[in-house]
């Protein structure tokens, strides 16, 4: 282990790395069930769903193992959120345009992912992606971590537990707080929300308990604070389901199959590239889609690597991460593997930050998570019972910690402050790391040009900004 991962050199141990790997896996285990749901339009139990489920586990493991041994970094990969939703939308449009079934359209769009992965492999081998990283201004790089932190908190508070999501005029605590006249009392909200009210209350309370447990343990120097906090939150949530909701949180385990559906994967997704339908969608559309996938994936990955590495102290004084080329190459291999297995773009997950916060510093963290993905081919029903409240407590805590990176931003320099501020707004709102970086890059370039300092901006920075402008306003 020492010879492969250099544990002592990185100030860590086997125990710490394994706990960090488990922590990262638990915070992103939701992707195992959610990815096939999104890519198949929730066609649960169908051959395509089973194939995508296995593809998710296998492709995530392959990409993460490559990251572990090639880059020796504690980053974990899986099919990217946002990218998978975009994939599903495109597949649906292709099915309608070509008047074909969804599975055939799905296999046509897989060709786009394959081409994207091959392009990334070439860009990584020839150091072009590394040069793109260096073309991102220092101020923007310093703000990526805090912006990701806000996005993690937004996921934890909004998407996972819905603490401020509004629906039907009645909802969660944050919206009740704005009711200055007291009309929206708990009893009124309960009457309108029905059974969902108790579910919401249990989820929110459990999330905060998990968060406070993590904070208290972290203050005491417990390295497994995030993992323990998630376990405590899970137990409390399960107990609450039994006691207060009268439901069985483990009901999904009854009659569940623990055997991987390899036959369905071979029949529907494994190397199932439908190039005939791919060429039928038109060259302009195909190229536009490939460029869109490439840009989103590239800057999502770069942002995650830079932001998480900065939080872990893995960057130099200029904000650059050693072995960036190897990390980007691992990401490209993951995307190609994902396309071959039958899933959307595989990318580095922002949830890797939770493992880093738990002490993960080497590829052993990644290797641990990779083994868990492979194990989930057999224990997927078990992974699915991890409540959103437990995941949210970890995401919010890590997001808070990542905000500390703002102290490195020079607030006296508007060239840094304005792009960082816009990125802090854009990233959680859009839910895309790449879009946040794009807005920051465009604003940085515009400020430099109109302040008479255009020569301070590199040619590659201009090119990237122009590509983002095209992406936002020209490519549909």
Q: Where would I find each of the regions flagged by the language model?
A:
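Helix-loop-helix hairpins and the membrane-proximal interhelical loops
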Residues: 1-53, 192-194, 230-324, 468-470
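Helix-loop-helix junctions within the multi-pass membrane cores of secondary transporters/permeases
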Residues: 1-35, 59-60, 80-89, 93-145, ...
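Alpha-helical membrane-protein architecture signal
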Residues: 11, 15, 209, 287-291, ...
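Hydrophobic/aromatic residues within the transmembrane alpha-helices of Major Facilitator Superfamily
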Residues: 22-29, 62-65, 69, 153, ...
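Transmembrane helix-loop junctions in multipass membrane proteins, especially transporters and channels
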Residues: 36, 40, 68, 72-76, ...
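Helix-coil boundary and interhelical linker segments in multi-pass alpha-helical membrane proteins
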Residues: 37-51, 91-108, 280-286, 387, ...
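Juxtamembrane transmembrane-helix boundary signature
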Residues: 59-81
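Membrane-embedded alpha-helical modules
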Residues: 95, 102-232, 367-476
């Amino acid at each position: 282990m020492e010879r492969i991962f250099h544990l002592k050199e990185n100030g860590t141990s086997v125990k710490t790395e394994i706990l960090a790997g488990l922590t990262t896996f638990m915070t992103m285990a939701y992707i195992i069930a959610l990815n096939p749901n999104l890519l198949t339009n929730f066609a649960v139990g169908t051959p395509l769903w089973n194939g995508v489920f296995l593809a998710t586990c296998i492709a995530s493991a392959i990409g993460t193992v490559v990251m572990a041994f090639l880059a020796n970094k504690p980053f974990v990969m899986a099919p990217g959120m946002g990218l998978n939703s975009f994939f599903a939308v495109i597949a649906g449009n292709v099915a309608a345009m070509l008047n074909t079934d969804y599975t055939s359209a799905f296999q046509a769009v897989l060709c786009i992912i394959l081409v994207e992965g091959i392009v990334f492999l070439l860009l990584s081998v020839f150091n072009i992606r590394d040069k793109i990283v260096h073309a991102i201004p220092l101020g923007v790089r310093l703000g990526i971590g805090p912006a990701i932190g806000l996005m993690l908190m937004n996921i934890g508070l909004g998407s996972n537990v819905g603490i401020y999501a509004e629906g039907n005029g009645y909802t969660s605590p944050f919206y009740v707080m704005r009711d200055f006249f007291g009309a929206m009392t708990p009893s009124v909200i309960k009457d309108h929300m029905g059974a969902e009210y108790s579910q919401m209350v249990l989820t929110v309370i459990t999330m905060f308990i998990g968060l406070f447990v993590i904070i208290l343990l972290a203050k005491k120097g417990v390295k497994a604070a995030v993992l323990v906090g998630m376990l405590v939150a899970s137990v409390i949530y399960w107990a609450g389901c039994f006691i207060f909701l009268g439901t069985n949180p483990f009901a999904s385990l009854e009659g569940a199959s623990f055997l991987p559906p390899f036959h369905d994967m071979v029949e529907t997704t494994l190397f199932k590239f439908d190039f005939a339908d791919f060429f039928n969608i038109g060259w302009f559309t195909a190229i536009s889609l490939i460029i869109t996938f490439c840009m989103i994936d590239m800057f999502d990955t770069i942002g995650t690597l830079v932001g998480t590495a900065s939080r872990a102290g893995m960057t130099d004084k200029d904000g650059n991460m050693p072995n960036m080329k190897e990390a980007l190459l691992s990401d490209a291999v993951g995307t190609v593997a994902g396309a071959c297995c039958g899933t959307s773009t595989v990318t580095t997950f922002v949830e890797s930050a939770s493992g880093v916060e738990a002490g993960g510093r080497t590829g052993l963290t990644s290797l641990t998570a990779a083994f868990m993905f492979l194990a989930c081919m057999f224990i997927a029903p078990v992974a699915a019972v991890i409540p959103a409240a437990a995941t949210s407590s970890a995401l919010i805590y890590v997001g808070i910690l990542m905000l500390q990176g703002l102290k490195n931003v020079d607030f006296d320099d508007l060239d840094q402050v304005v792009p960082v501020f816009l990125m802090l707004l854009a990233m959680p709102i859009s839910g895309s790391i790449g879009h946040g970086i794009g807005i920051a890059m465009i604003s940085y370039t515009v400020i430099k040009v109109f302040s008479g300092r255009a020569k301070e901006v590199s040619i590659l920075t201009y090119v990237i900004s122009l590509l983002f402008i095209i992406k936002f306003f020209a490519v549909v």
